[in-house]
């Protein structure tokens, strides 16, 4: 598809579809099925460029302005990258499955997780990311260019959080869990800046 050229007849047909609002008559679920199929291909960016070039984004992807994603990634990571490049507003009109939403939420939190954040904000970021539960997903997301300036910091922070023994939370009373967890997170943060 990378070198694929659309013929004149197909261009005219796509223009007609765009003007007729035919896509608006399709179900949200059908739209997502086609989007997911394109995300699973190695030419997802080309698909979204085509939608943009022929104005086939109404009403489902009206917030699409940047169609580029790293085509070597999983469908979930491609979608998260597209969301990030489109101000996290791309999936507002379509039924995005939870596994895709997970990656979008994680990427948004990873972008917000910066080295110069105040400690309380960094703690909130760590709690949102839940490194123990989402380690595999974050490893894939950290390879995105959008995180390149912060990748080393996040990787070091993740390593330090994962190195802490959160199993000790089982041994403390319910009243103490929050304080012990906070202590472990602060220790991981301190080790990250050391």
At which residue positions do the language-model features occur?
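Short, polar/flexible loop-turn hinges at active-site or ligand-entry regions and domain interfaces
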Residues: 2-8
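Conserved, hydrophobic alpha-helical core segments of structured domains
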Residues: 12, 16-149
């Amino acid at each position: 598809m990378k070198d694929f050229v659309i013929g004149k007849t197909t261009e005219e047909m796509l223009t007609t579809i765009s003007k007729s609002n035919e896509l608006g008559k399709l179900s949200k679920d059908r739209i997502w099925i086609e989007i997911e199929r394109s995300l699973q291909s190695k030419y997802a960016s080309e698909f979204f460029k085509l939608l943009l070039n022929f104005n086939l984004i109404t009403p489902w992807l009206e917030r699409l302005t940047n169609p580029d994603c790293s085509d070597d990634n999983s469908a979930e990571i491609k979608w998260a990258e597209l969301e990030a490049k489109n101000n996290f507003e791309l999936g507002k009109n379509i039924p995005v499955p939870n596994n895709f939403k997970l990656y979008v939420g994680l990427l948004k939190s990873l972008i917000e997780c910066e080295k110069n954040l105040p400690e309380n904000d960094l703690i909130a970021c760590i709690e949102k990311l839940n490194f123990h539960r989402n380690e595999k997903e974050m490893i894939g997301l950290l390879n995105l260019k959008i995180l390149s300036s912060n990748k080393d910091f996040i990787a070091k922070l993740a390593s330090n959080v994962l190195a802490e023994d959160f199993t000790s939370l089982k041994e403390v009373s319910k009243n103490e869990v929050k304080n012990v967890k906070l202590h472990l997170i602060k220790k991981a943060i301190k080790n990250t800046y050391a």
